[in-house]
Structure formats: structure tokens, C-alpha cells
Amino acid sequence: MSLKDSAKIALSLMDLTTLNDNDTDEKVITLCQQGKTEFGTPAAVCVYPRFVPIARKALKAQGTEQVKIATVTNFPHGNDDIDIAVAETKAAVAYGADEVDVVFPYKALMAGNEQIGFELVQQCKAVCQASNVLLKVIIETGELKTAELIRKASEISIKAGADFIKTSTGKVPVNATLESARIMLETIRDLNVADRVGFKAAGGVKTAEEAAQYLALAQEILGHDWVNSDHFRFGASSLLTNLLAALNGQANQKVSGY
């Protein structure tokens, strides 16, 4: 597959993201506008819960209502208070989110507690399922570090009902890597849940070339047809600029950002 071909696919799989403390309505509207490109639209935009309504309005105004709106809960620290995570998830659904990316209580798992993660995901899933909202679970691979813990967090999340497992918040030093992606994709394969569980690489995927490596990895492990927006996403912001440069045939420029 040519770089242009894979860049076009990657664009359609993006959750175009802004999760910054200084986000404003204007910045969210600009993000939505950036997603309307001559090469198509991303799968979703991802914003903080309070910006979900303004994103909905902006997407409708520009005629790209097919773009989903994702948001985050228990973010970014993955605390182990289930009640707070559930309350935040209920609020996210009430704001009108199509998808919720919840942070798994990874520190609790690192301390040996598997149950709290299962219960947190299970209860957030119940909230989402009742409103037909997709639940992605961020396991924070860069903090879990070991293959054993990354696999365990993936397994717990899947068994508790995750629709997607996601690498990272983008708020820690190490975010998505091909190594952690492989473990997560192989877990989806090994548990025989490829038909109902997807994968999201977030943070650290900056270039069309890097995106192509993730697509190739997913195709290798789960098959060519599996890689679509129902099963695969990139959480990114700066990646879009680079994908558009590749699609326009320009030299790739490194860009800063998530």
C-alpha cells in the first residue's frame, strides 16, 4: 500500500483530539473545522465533556454530522474511585457524547488489585450501553510498562465489557508504542473478541509513516478487513497536518503536539 493510500485510511480512523487545560469553545470549533478536509473526515473528534454540545453544533453547521463525538472520564489519572468514574461517565453521556474514553485504574492494578478495574469498567459500560454509547478503556501502557501488566489490563477491560482498548491518555511521558500495540492486538486475537473489541493508539503517532506501521501491525494480527473505524482508531491532533501533507504529496514535516 502506498503512503498516500495508508494516509487516507489513517485520516478516516482518527479521533481528532484536543484535551488541553486552555481549551475554549473557539478552539473546539476550529478543531471540528480542521476535520473537514478534501480527503474526507475523521471518525470522531475527542474533547472534554463540557465541549461536547459545542462540537455537536459545529459539526452540524459544517455538514459533517457523521463525525462522532468522543470524550474522556476518570481522566487523566485513572483514579480508583468507581463512584466518581461512573458519575463522570453519566455526565458525559448526558452532554451527548457518542463515545466515552475512560481511564482504567492502572495504578491499582500495578499494586495488585484486579477487581477494582473490572468493576469500574463494568459499571461505566452499563451507563454507556443504556444510551448506546461506545466505551473505550485507556489502560495507560506507558505507565504499566511490562507486557504482563499491559496484557492483564487489556484482558480485564475486555472481560468487563470494553468496546475498545486504548493505549494512552497522551498525558504521560510514554504513550502509544508499536510494542504495546502488538500486545493489545494479540490479546484481542487470543480472547477471540475481534468481532466486538477494537483498538486505539493514542499519543505519539505523529507522522503518516508511523500511522502506516500501526495499520500494518493490526492487519498482520487481525486481518486486512478488520482495520476500519468500528475496530481501529488513532487518538491524535498533530497527526492530521502530516497526513494531509502526505496526501498532498508534500515532504513530511515533523509537528509538535499530541
Curated annotation (Swiss-Prot):
Q: Which InterPro entries match?
A: Aldolase_TIM, DeoC, DeoC/FbaB/LacD_aldolase, DeoC_typeII
Catalytic machinery residues: D101, K166, K200
- Pfam families attached here? DeoC
Q: Which residues form the signal peptide?
A: none
Q: Which domain of life is it from?
A: Bacteria
Q: Where in the cell is it found?
A: Cytoplasm
Name residues in a coiled coil: none
| Enzyme class of the recorded protein, top EC level | lyase
Keywords from UniProt, A to Z, are: Cytoplasm, Lyase, Schiff base
- List GO terms (cellular component aspect): cytoplasm
Catalytic activity from the UniProt record: 2-deoxy-D-ribose 5-phosphate = D-glyceraldehyde 3-phosphate + acetaldehyde
| One example GO MF annotation | deoxyribose-phosphate aldolase activity
Enumerate the Gene3D superfamilies for this protein: Aldolase class I
Q: Which PANTHER family match?
A: DEOXYRIBOSE-PHOSPHATE ALDOLASE (PTHR10889:SF3)
What name does UniProt use for this protein? Deoxyribose-phosphate aldolase
